[in-house]
């Protein structure tokens, strides 16, 4: 619909049911709606063929529930426009083993979208943002107010449009958006303790290989935006113990025995 400049019409709601303005199948779950569509087509003699097939669907990694992708407003950090800088940062770090740098490089080179840092969860670090109830303009907390939870603390003031009512941001930060700040947090802690020597880049980061694309990558991104060329001089990448060949130990799978 974007290519054709058509307005977005939401069919599936966040609760997994069909929107009220969709004829015939409103209020049904996605699975029930599929069955009802087939029934209606068959009833009107419009169904040419129906057969079972096997195909790939997206599922939740732990419980296996089918996942439906729903477009929504989210917060992003720009990474697509700084790919060259991120590649240079990766080259400036010593990787152990050296082959692991290839994973980082391949991830950066093949990025197709920016970093989504917002999540619809209960627990997490809140965004200090309120939206004008009339025009939707975001209003940010002053640095002196931080930390602040907009769900608990109302915004005082008026929007440029004259409205004085505001809606708090309910999303929270992705866990990588905070864990990627470890060098900055350590530096600030050291400064608070009176340590004046250069603290970043730190000496070494140790981590497992499967989070090169997350923890290592996002820490390098944050370090770039916080005016540090690299977060650490060396990064040591390790593996992890498998429950059986090709399967990692997982609490949800109960295979840790």
Regions found by a protein language model. Give the residues of each.
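Conserved active-site neighborhood of enzyme catalytic/cofactor-binding cores
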Residues: 9-10, 16, 107-114, 118-257
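Residue patterns forming the tRNA-binding/recognition surfaces of aminoacyl-tRNA synthetases
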Residues: 2-135, 215, 247, 257
